Amino acid sequence: MAHSRARRRKRASATQLYQTCKAAGTCPSDIIPKVEHNTIADQILKWGSLGVFFGGLGIGTGSGTGGRTGYIPLQSTPRPEIPSGPTTRPPILVDTVAPGDPSIVSLVEESAIINSGAPELVPPSHGGFEITTSESTTPAILDVSVTTHTTSTSVFRNPSFADPSVVQSQPAVEAGGHILISTSTISSHPVEEIPLDTFIVSSSDSNPASSTPIPASGARPRIGLYSKALHQVQVTDPAFLSSPQRLITFDNPAYEGEDVSLEFAHNTIHQPPDDAFMDIIRLHRPAIQSRRGRVRFSRIGQRGSMYTRSGKHIGGRIHFYQDISPISAAAEEIELHPLVATAHDTSLFDIYAEPDPDFTEEPVPLSFSTSTPFQRSSVSATPWGNTTVPLSLPGDMFVQPGPDIIFPTASTTTPYSPVTPALPTGPVFISGATFYLYPAWYFARKRRKRVSLFFADVAA
């Protein structure tokens, strides 16, 4: 048999228990302090309020009456009442015109004119004299004679005094009357030259270039090409100076100029002509500077090694440079001799002129010794005049026509003596018409000549 649980009854509230158990003295220990507001919290508020003032907030366990001053009701502005019925316009009074009234309304004229500021004439009440006022409309004409003053000014020039100014200023005169000025504006005496002073305080040159002050020149901004953020790469290809785009791509071989920034777009993986320019997407403008006694040509390149989804590229910056030439000191000046003839030389050397039949030639014998076969030529020399050199050539020789050349000749008063060359000291070996070679070089071993890709003035 299942037992049913007893129903739990609700306990009476503290106020109900206090009303029944107060007189009998059987109230629990927590009922009386709670109803009489004498709990620990009430005691803290009671003794703490002596040192802390909360104003009229009414903080406590009492009823919500707003403290001692109570709550201040908020004043509200009364809303004006709007009538719901139809509104009527107030009538306007209109002056009516009778049928017999004239259509033109005459203006009302004032009977008396009052002049402000004028004294009022009051007629006397008792007998007296009369005041007669007369007014004339004709204006008064005054006979005033105008007196004219004539002022004359004369200027006398002192020839012993030199006026430094060119234009002479006019003297100060009165504004009224007639003014007579007899002076010239431009003087006829010579002008005095005043030297200008220079403002240069200090200068490195011996002679100043101008008379303006030397401006304070600040330090020129240096290009940060050798910082740790840039990778230094030396380029040896000469195309880097004129057309650097040929080292990066094959698509656009057109030359765009050396003073512009070059941009490249690589949609696919490609191999550049130079491996040093791998993944280069931009080359900045060139810069020429001096570096350790050399002229250096530089460009800054931007790599595009990685791209994000937003389109931003990630890559390092590279400093490409190439040394053009060393900066050497000033070369020694060498005096050049004139290559033209003097004024007294009138002889001409004509290679196309025919030999003179009346002129007798004296052949000069020459001895030749060589190990290679050749055709002997007859050479004739004369001390002055035209010189004829007949040559026997193995084939036809093309002669380019040119101008006549004037060479200095020996004087007729001095006997002719041929000049012996200092070098070579040994015998002369001739092979052909215009070529000679030393015999020791005939059997010399020929070496293959290797041409370096560097510039001629750049050290390896």
From Swiss-Prot:
Stretches assigned to coiled coil: none
Chief location bin: virion
S-S bridge residues: C21-C27
Protein family (similarity comment): Belongs to the papillomaviridae L2 protein family.
General function of this protein: Minor protein of the capsid that localizes along the inner surface of the virion, within the central cavities beneath the L1 pentamers. Plays a role in capsid stabilization through interaction with the major capsid protein L1. Once the virion enters the host cell, L2 escorts the genomic DNA into the nucleus by promoting escape from the endosomal compartments and traffic through the host Golgi network.
Name of encoding gene: L2
Chain span(s) of sequence motif Nuclear localization signal: 1-12, 443-451
Annotated GO MF terms: DNA binding; structural molecule activity
Post-translational modification: Highly phosphorylated.
Keywords assigned by UniProt, alphabetized: Capsid protein, Cytoplasmic inwards viral transport, Disulfide bond, DNA-binding, Host endosome, Host Golgi apparatus, Host nucleus, Host-virus interaction, Late protein, Microtubular inwards viral transport, Phosphoprotein, Viral penetration into host nucleus, Virion, Virus entry into host cell
Subunit-structure text: Interacts with major capsid protein L1. Interacts with E2; this interaction inhibits E2 transcriptional activity but not the DNA replication function E2. Interacts with host GADD45GIP1. Interacts with host HSPA8; this interaction is required for L2 nuclear translocation. Interacts with host importins KPNB2 and KPNB3. Forms a complex with importin alpha2-beta1 heterodimers via interaction with the importin alpha2 adapter. Interacts with host DYNLT1; this interaction is essential for virus intracellular transport during entry.
InterPro entries the record matches: Late_L2
GO cellular component, one term: host cell endosome
BP terms from Gene Ontology: microtubule-dependent intracellular transport of viral material towards nucleus; symbiont entry into host cell; viral penetration into host nucleus
Cellular localization per UniProt: Virion; Host nucleus; Host early endosome; Host Golgi apparatus
Name of the protein in its database record: Minor capsid protein L2
